[in-house]
Structure formats: C-alpha cells, structure tokens
C-alpha cells in the first residue's frame, strides 16, 4: 500500500536482537504423546484385541496338549501361539510406523503456513519475509485479503475492516482506524489493534508488531491447522459400505465353518443337525438386525455364542459320541473357534483405511512437488472426478509478468514524460493511486510487491527515472476508494503540491468504466478513436487501464456510497499491458479436454481479450459463436432456467464479477457436473466454497486460500491438470488394493470352508492365515497405495462420482481369478487327501485311493502354492487398467522392496527350521525341485496376463 509517512523499520541487527529477546513468530504445537504411548494405543484396536483373544485361546490349546495330553511334540506345541503374538507385534509395528509417516506428510500444511510471505519495511526498504521471521518492532503492510501475521498497533488505516471471528465469534468484520474519534468503546479488541490470524476483508493499513508467536492472542488459544479429514466423501461412504458387506459375508463363512467342523467331528450325527438351526438364526440376526453394531462387537458376540453352543455339545457329548474323549472335543472346539475368528480377521478389510491413508499421504506429498498444496483431504479424491474447470485468466493461463506494452496518454508529446503539468499529474496519479510497491533489496532485479498490474506501472515510472516513493511522500491522502471487482476502478483524493489550496482526485481502472465517468478528454480525443485503440489492444490479448483526474476544492463531494460522484473528470489516456500466455498452458488445456474435462474462462477482462487468450490456449476455435461467450451483465440477466440450458455451451465469461463465478458453479452443479474453480481474491471465497474443489492461487489472499481445498503454489493451469491426474491415480490405487484383497478373500474363505466340510485339517492354520492377512492387508496396502500416477488416466473420461468403486471389470476379475485359485487349490486338496504325495512331481503319475488325510508336507504345499499364486497376482493387480505391462517397474522402488520382502519372507518361513515350527511347516521344508515347480506353475497367472496384454497392444 502507499504510505502517508516514510518508515525506516528495523535494521538487520535490530531484527536479530528482537528475535533473541521476544522469540520467533511460531506457535508452539501442543506436546504430543510419547512414541511408546502411541505404540501401545495400537493394541486398543478391536482387531488386535480379537487377535490377542485368538492368541490366548491358542495358548490354552497348547497348554492342554502339553500337560493334559502329553503330545509327542512337547514344547513345539507352543510355537503356534508364539507365532500369533509375533504376527500381532509385526502388524502393530508396521501400522504404527506408517501412521507416523502419514502424520509427517499431513503436517506439511502448518509448515507452509509459516512460510507464507509478509510485506514489511526494513532498513528503509519495502521487502517480504516469511511469516515465521516477523519480529516485535517490525513495520508490516497489510492489504485486502491478507492474514495478519502478528499482534500489533496500527500506524495507518484506510477503509480497514478485519474479520476477527476466529477470536471473538463475531460474523461482522470489525472496523479499524487510527483516529481516536472513531474508536469503538464496546469493541472486543481495540479499534487501532490488529491480531494474528484475523483477516483483512477490505482496505489496507500499516501496523507495528507488538507480540509474536505464543504471546499473541491467537497463540493463547492456538489449535494447529489440520487437514480436514472429517468430510464424508462418496468414496469414503462407499468404502464404509463395502467394509460392512465384506464383514457380513465373513460371518456367513465363520458360521458355516463352525457348523461344518462340528458335523464332521461328530460324523454328521442327527443331533448336531439340530444345533445348526440356532447357529444359522444367530448369524442371521447378527448380520441383518444389528447394523448399528461394530464388526468387533459382532465378533465378540460370536465368541460368546460359540461358548454357549459348545456347552450344549458338551452336555450331549455322551449321546453324540461316547467313544470320543472330552479332551479331544474341547481341543477341537477351541481350534474351530480360533479358525472361525481368524477367518473373520482375515476377511475384514482392516487394511483398507491404511491403504486410503497411505494413498492420500503419498499423493499429497507428490502433489506438493507438482505445486499442489492439499488443504482438505477429500479434494485429492474429488479432483479425479472433476468434469469442469472454471479458471481465471491472469496468472493462471498467463505468466502474470506484467509489462507496459504501450501508452496512449493524449497530453504527452511522443509519450515522453517531462516536467509539464500533464506529465506531473500522470506521474503523481500512478504513484499515489496504487497499493503496490517495489522491493529494491536486489537493485539489479527489483521485485514487485502487491498487484502485478500496478507494479508494472511503478516499474514504468522507474524506467522513466521517476521515484514513486518520493511522489508518495509529497502528498497527503485525504480519502480513497480501494479497487473492487464490482466497481472495476480505484480512486484517491489527495492534497498535492501541484495545486495549492486545491485537491486532486485520481481515478484508475477499466477504460470503458473510467471513460464513462469523465466529462472530457485531454486534447479532445474523439470517443471513436479511443474505442478503436482499445479494440486493437484487446485483440492482442492486452490488459488495458484507463486514467482520469479532476482538480477540486475542499468542499466538492467526490465519493458517495462507495462510488465516484465527481462530475468533471478528465480522461488522460490508456495503457496497454502485456501478460503472455504460459508456454505450458496450451498443452495442459488440450490434455484436460482429451480427458473429458470442460474448461471455462471466467475473467474480468473484455470479451475481445478473453477470446484472444482462449484462441492462444486452444479453447476458442473458429467454430465457436456468440452462444459460447457471454459478458458479466448479460450473464447476470439470465434466469436460473435460462442459465442451466446454456451453461454447458459457455466457454468464456468476460467482465465477470465474483458472484458470477459462484452462480456459474451452482448452475453446473445443478447439471450434475463436478466443478473445480480457481480464485485468488477475497471476493472469490464464496465460489471457492461452493465448488466441489476450490483451487486458490499461491499468490492469492489468505481469505481465498482458507476457503479453498487445494492451493496451486505456482498459479499455473498445468498444475491443475496434474492435480486431476493425481486424483484419478489415487482412486485407481485404492481400486487395485481392493482387487487384490477381495481376490485373496474369495480364495481363502472358500478354501477354509471347503476344508471344514471335507473333514480335513484346516488347509490354512491360524498363523498361516495371519501371514496371508499380513500380505493381503498390510503389505498390499503399502505396495499398491504408493504407485506413481499413469498419464494414461488422462485419456479416460471422468468417472461417475457416485459410481460404485468396484466396477464390472473388477468384479469379473475378483470372481474369475479368485474362483480359479479356489478351484485349483480345492483340486490339490482333494488329490493330496486321496494320495500319498512325497514330491510335487508325483501329481503327474498318481493313483487316487482312500481318504488318508493330509500330511504336514502336503499342507506345506497347499500353503506355499496359495501364497505364491497370490504373490504373482499382486503384479497383475498393480498393472490393472494401466495399459502397461505388469513388469513395468519405473518409479516403483517401494513396490519392488515390498515384493522382495514377501518373497524372501515366504522362502524363509518354509526353509528356516525356527520359522517352520511357528507356521506348521513340514520339517526340512521343500526341495529345490518343489520350489521350481511351484514358482513356474504359480507364475502362469502373470504370464497369461502378459500374453493377453501383448495381444491387445498389437491389435491397438
């Protein structure tokens, strides 16, 4: 802003002393719980509690076998419970580690807030520093839309209104002034005081810092900025519903396993059949009638029911099976309950929240590197479903590097400034009717602070050897009207040395608006000539400004109701300012249009300027007509019904106001579009809040940033396209995790269920199922949640925001592949039960005989084949709908690391003697030949997919 006085501000030495005495301008976050306590909180997870119950049940069985039955294995019976507890420890440790990692990613918002630049005066020069570097004694300049960085006392205030609702709850902005006669006695805070965290809604001012950091009013009630993850998006609601469905199905399988194992144990006794009825009724009630119950509540009730059921079995034991020992019955019952509970644990997708969290954390970090700062978590997902982007022109489509292209000041000969009155009026008007300033810290590269358009004018003065600071110091500001997008001009009334006993009114803004306020023109230039000049500039996509002045006496009313009412203004001329299109924008717009996303320009510029920019970026074509463009006034005149019929055809709204942008968003939403909108000003906040995704600009106001969901740090449209790509990729990563997990679910649940009714030992033991669960949930979440985005997603149409996350292709994959794995393993289970297999190659020339049960070697084969088939299927899931080979690993170091852990872990589990005991693996493990056959056979799932991919690629 322009200063009424010259301020020196603090020197570098004084800054260091102040920081040492009063501290840094950083709010100390609340002390976090120690890491050990956070780790122990993981054991409060209901899933972990249920696993602990299973572990203690396993200990009970082992104790019974060791002391009651005196089994031959001796202490080896305790390896299974130890394995369960090791699995629990591993699961909690991994979850704890990645939760810490995600927290660090989400903390980035606070760090960025502290790095925001603030305009200050130091060493007699206006410059910018990070918010955290503000110190007591600093002179800070604040403008409309700024967030006040520290507590202080106002030195100057022009039409200053501040939103203090974050501190006092008042919805009406507080008026601020340095004039004692305007002080409000009943105000929550002093009229000449400004406070950290409050926002300038109108006007501008200068204040001196009196308190920083924890000593500010805001610091006393500090609550760290958080990424908002409380919003229930369509995706999160779908995932919640999917989890409920999977949980219900897991109870069906658990109930059937209990029934099946009991019937087999009692040789299908008729009395046992009577126990199936209450079991079926119980699970039906739990699944259908108690939707309000959490899944772990249902699991605990299942355990309680099972205890009651087993009590009934024990009571009728002598009638059912007098030749079976009570000890054997109890051991079988406990083992059955453990298998049922573990299956529920395996089936419930507890890894889904981790997959979503990791996907969000990873996406947010990588989006930050592509200049997208995510402020609200749901925006990551919603950007992927965006169908329309409503974008500003200046700074987003253009470089925002304003330079004076040409001047047309009618009183200047050869457009050269001199010492004449006309030149002096122009120089003074440009200098004082401005809120911008220039940072001369680096004299060879002056930096514009504030509005780039106004900065271009100040640089033009500099190029003409005119000091805007000296001009500002020679005048006294009497009154002013700040620029607004509604008025489209700004004005200032000053006491000037150019006119003794007179005042001068300077007006600057949109040429047609300013010219409309004027009574005459310098040198009597005809209106037609001015219009012709403007058309020429606008057709070159130039931004234009008009200038006017009036000399008045102190009694003339010049402002009324926020408008200029002076009636004798003289139009001085126009300035054309160039702002080239960003070089990467045409390709980015083309990419969005190929991705099925409509782009609409909403700008305050004229229709000619907007159309030329649209043409340069490839949006406006020779086929477009007047139905594709509309001016702000015409737009406002449309009824809602008329607008809804026309809105999809619109490509450009010129001379738009902020409320036009909000109304455009609402109309598009009524037409079932998912809308992202850009904004940088305070008045853009309503549109940013109304859109599905609000995109604020990095150099936008704090008000706009707070209203937005994502901040585009470099202001570029190409960064918006990257945000869409990341949003689509995040959604696909979650789909891939679900594809893999549900395929494993289908195979595991049906395999264990088949084993229960076939009367064999459970094909997968408790510890083996927990290892599968670790692969399926934790490791798969880690592997698939952090996959880099594929540019192929930008060739697809936007997804239906409300469509079910499991699409038709996924459904067929889950049923087909999961069913195939189940049938394959069921066939092997049947063969192993009816043949004595000592080497896997025996399958090629075997003869089936009577049922002889499963040997430890055969169970080891089943377990290893199950894991390795799904291991290779993980590659397929990773490549799902990418159009790439499953062996394409560019940028997937994390995936390769996790795949290596799974592969090495499985080999170690089968071959290391100490782990063999924990996971019920046959002593001695498998032979090299067995491993070769298993790896070659199970990898066919990968090679078949690759062959199909090659066939499709060749056809395309």
Model regions and ranges:
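Alpha-helical transmembrane segments and their membrane-interface junctions
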Residues: 819-836, 906-918
């Amino acid at each position: 802003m322009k200063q009424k006085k010259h301020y020196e501000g603090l020197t570098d030495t004084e800054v260091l002393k102040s920081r040492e005495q009063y501290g840094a301008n950083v709010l100390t976050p609340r002390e976090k719980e120690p890491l050990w306590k956070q780790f122990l909180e993981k054991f409060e997870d209901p899933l972990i509690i249920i696993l602990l119950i299973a572990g203690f049940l396993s200990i009970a069985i082992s104790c019974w076998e060791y002391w009651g039955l005196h089994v031959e294995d001796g202490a080896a019976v305790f390896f299974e419970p130890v394995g369960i507890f090791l699995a629990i420890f591993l699961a909690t440790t991994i979850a704890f580690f990645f939760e810490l990692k995600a927290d660090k990613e989400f903390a980035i918002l606070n760090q960025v807030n502290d790095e925001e630049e603030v305009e200050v005066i130091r060493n007699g020069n206006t410059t910018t520093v990070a918010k955290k570097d503000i110190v007591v004694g600093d002179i800070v300049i604040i403008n409309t839309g700024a967030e006040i960085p520290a507590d202080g006392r106002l030195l100057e205030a022009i039409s200053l209104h501040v939103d203090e609702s974050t501190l006092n709850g008042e919805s009406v902005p507080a008026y601020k002034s340095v004039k004692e006669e305007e002080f409000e006695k009943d105000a929550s805070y002093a009229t000449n005081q400004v406070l950290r965290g409050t926002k300038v809604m109108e006007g501008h001012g200068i204040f001196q810092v009196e308190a920083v950091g924890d000593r500010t009013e805001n610091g006393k009630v500090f609550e760290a900025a958080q990424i908002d993850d409380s919003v229930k998006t369509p995706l999160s609601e779908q995932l919640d519903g999917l989890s409920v469905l999977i949980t219900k199905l897991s109870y069906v399988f658990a109930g059937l396993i209990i029934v099946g194992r009991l019937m087999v144990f009692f040789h299908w006794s008729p009395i046992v059949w009577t126990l199936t009825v209450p079991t079926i009724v119980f699970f039906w009630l739990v699944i259908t009638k108690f939707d309000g119950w959490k899944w772990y509540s249902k699991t605990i009730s299942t355990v309680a029911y099972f205890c009651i059921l087993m009590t009934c079995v024990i009571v009728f034991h002598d009638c059912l099976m007098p030749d079976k020992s009570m000890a054997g019955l109890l051991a079988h019952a406990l083992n059955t309950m453990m298998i049922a509970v573990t299956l529920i644990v395996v089936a419930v997708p507890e890894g889904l929240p981790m997959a979503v969290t990791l996907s969000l954390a990873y996406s947010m970090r990588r989006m930050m590197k592509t200049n997208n700062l995510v402020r609200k978590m749901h925006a990551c997902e919603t950007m992927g479903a965006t169908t329309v982007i409503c974008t500003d022109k200046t700074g987003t489509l253009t470089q925002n590097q304003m330079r004076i292209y040409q001047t047309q000041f009618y009183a200047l000969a050869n457009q050269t400034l001199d010492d004449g009155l006309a030149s002096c009026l122009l120089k003074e008007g440009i200098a004082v009717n401005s809120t911008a300033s220039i940072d001369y810290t680096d004299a060879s590269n002056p930096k514009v602070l504030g509005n780039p358009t106004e900065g271009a004018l100040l640089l033009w003065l500099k190029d003409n050897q005119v000091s805007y600071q000296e001009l500002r110091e020679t005048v006294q500001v009497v009154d002013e009207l700040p620029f607004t997008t509604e008025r489209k001009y700004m004005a200032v009334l000053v006491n000037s040395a150019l006119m003794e006993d007179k005042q001068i009114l300077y007006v600057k803004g949109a040429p047609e608006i300013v010219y409309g306020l004027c009574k005459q023109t310098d040198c009597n230039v005809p209106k037609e000539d001015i219009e012709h000049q403007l058309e020429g500039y606008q057709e070159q996509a130039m931004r234009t400004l008009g200038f006017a002045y009036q000399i008045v006496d102190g009694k003339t009313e010049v402002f009324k109701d926020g408008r200029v009412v002076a009636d004798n203004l003289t139009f001085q001329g126009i300035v054309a300012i160039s702002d080239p299109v960003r070089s990467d924008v045409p390709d980015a717009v083309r990419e969005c249009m190929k991705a099925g996303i409509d782009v609409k320009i909403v700008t305050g510029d004229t229709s000619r300027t907007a159309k030329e920019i649209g043409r340069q970026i490839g949006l406006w074509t020779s086929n477009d007509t007047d139905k594709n463009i509309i001016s702000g006034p015409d737009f406002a005149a449309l009824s809602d019904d008329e607008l809804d019929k026309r809105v999809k055809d619109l490509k450009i709204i010129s001379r738009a106001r902020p409320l036009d942008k909000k109304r455009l968003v609402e109309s598009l939403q009524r037409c079932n579009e998912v809308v992202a909108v850009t904004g940088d000003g305070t008045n853009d906040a309503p549109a940013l809040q109304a859109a599905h995704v609000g995109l604020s600009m990095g150099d936008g106001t704090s008000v706009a940033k707070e209203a937005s969901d994502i901040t585009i740090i470099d202001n570029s449209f190409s960064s918006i396209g990257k945000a869409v790509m990341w949003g689509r990729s995040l959604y696909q990563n979650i789909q891939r995790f679900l594809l893999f997990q549900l395929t494993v679910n289908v195979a595991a649940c049906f395999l264990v269920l088949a084993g229960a009714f076939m009367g064999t030992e459970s094909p997968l033991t408790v510890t083996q199922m927990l290892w599968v669960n670790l692969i399926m949930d934790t490791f798969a979440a880690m592997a698939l949640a952090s996959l880099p985005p594929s540019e192929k997603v930008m060739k697809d149409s936007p997804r239906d925001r409300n469509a079910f996350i499991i699409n038709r292709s996924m459904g067929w994959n889950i049923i087909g592949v999961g069913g195939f794995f189940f049938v394959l393993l069921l066939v092997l289970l049947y063969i192993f039960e009816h043949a004595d297999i000592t080497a896997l190659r025996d399958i090629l020339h075997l003869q089936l005989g009577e049922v002889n049960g499963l040997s430890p070697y055969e169970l080891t084969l089943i377990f290893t084949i199950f894991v390795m088939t799904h291991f290779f299927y993980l590659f397929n899931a990773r490549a799902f709908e990418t159009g790439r080979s499953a062996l394409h690993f560019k940028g997937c170091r994390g995936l390769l690391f996790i795949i290596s852990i799974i592969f090495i872990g499985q080999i170690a589990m089968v071959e290391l003697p100490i782990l063999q005991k924990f996971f019920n693996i046959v002593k001695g493990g498998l032979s090299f030949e067995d491993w070769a056959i298993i790896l070659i056979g199970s990898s066919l799932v990968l090679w078949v997919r690759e062959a199909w991919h090659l066939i499709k690629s060749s056809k395309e």
